[in-house]
């Protein structure tokens, strides 16, 4: 092979590893973000170590590992895969990292609105710059919403680990890329029952995965659709009620004005923030969240944070 052909061959090869930097805003709350990403110390998809974290992702069809060092004003990222990465791997990794770190929206308008109200300003005290942290992709957000229905966070973590172990894909570094719709669609309800899934939860999760595989629920299209259309599409899916729909809209699609009414963390956060003698019912939750519009997703994330590790 002559030198020109060798040069062309090398240029045509797709890398298995690449690095890039992502600019972070001033006073980015890195420690708080790392705390959120590391809530499950036994996670099979993410690991936090000091000021760094690693997470299993899908880049194209390739299970990959993204290692990220959070430094002042920058996130240094290294993407690694067991096979060759697609040509747009860096763009995909940047997009997913931006979602994970909450960089797709600016907190300033929400914070200005809070600071203008003496009653609401305490919500952001000590948490200026806090973000809406999204899931790496929309299906992961859907999975979290279904797993988290009517159970506490610790058990939701347990169910997700079992699901990842069964339907996720090994990535470098000993972590897994999360389950994709096709893998979940191949599961049977009876199998998930052995993992302590309720029958309904198993049916809902497998059912939504099969709808996605069949093209009946297009998550890519919903990513650019208006909020009303997204909510209607989600509510049409068996197993997704108003709480699940708003959770998915917030964490999977990044909508800024969602209220996951009935969420246990939201209920406890509202009771704590407003010093209520009793936990608010659904109507009271909507009324209490009204002053935070049109930034109720932001308020929800802050209310969760008031609970510390409980949320």
Predicted regions and their residues:
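HhH-family (HhH-GPD) DNA N-glycosylase catalytic core used in base-excision repair
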Residues: 4-311
């Amino acid at each position: 092979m002559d030198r020109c052909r060798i040069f062309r061959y090398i240029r045509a090869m797709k890398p298995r590893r690449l690095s890039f930097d992502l600019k972070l805003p001033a006073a980015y709350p890195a420690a708080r973000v790392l705390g959120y990403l590391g809530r499950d110390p036994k996670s099979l998809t993410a690991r936090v170590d000091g000021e760094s974290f690693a997470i299993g992702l899908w880049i194209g069809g390739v299970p990959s590992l993204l290692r990220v060092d959070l430094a002042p004003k920058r996130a240094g990222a290294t993407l690694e895969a067991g096979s060759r990465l697609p040509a747009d791997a860096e763009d995909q990794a940047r997009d997913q990292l931006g979602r994970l770190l909450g960089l797709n929206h600016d907190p300033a308008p929400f914070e200005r609105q809070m600071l203008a109200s003496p009653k609401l300003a305490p919500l952001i005290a000590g948490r200026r710059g806090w973000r809406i942290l999204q899931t790496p992709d929309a299906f992961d957000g859907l999975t979290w919403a279904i797993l988290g229905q009517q159970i506490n966070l610790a058990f939701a973590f347990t169910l997700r680990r079992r699901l990842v172990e069964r339907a996720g894909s090994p990535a470098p570094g000993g972590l897994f890329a999360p389950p994709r719709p096709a893998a979940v669609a191949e599961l049977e309800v009876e199998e998930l029952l052995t993992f302590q899934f309720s029958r309904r939860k198993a049916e809902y999760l497998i059912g939504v995965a099969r709808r996605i595989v069949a093209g009946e629920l297009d998550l890519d299209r919903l990513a650019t659709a208006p909020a009303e259309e997204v909510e209607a599409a989600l509510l049409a899916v068996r197993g997704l009620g108003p709480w699940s729909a708003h959770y998915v809209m917030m964490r999977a699609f990044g909508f800024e004005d969602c209220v996951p009414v009935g969420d246990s963390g939201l209920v406890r956060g509202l009771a704590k923030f407003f010093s209520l003698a009793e936990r608010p019912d659904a109507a009271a939750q909507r009324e209490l969240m009204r002053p935070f519009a049109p930034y109720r997703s932001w308020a929800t994330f802050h209310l969760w944070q008031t609970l510390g590790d409980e949320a």
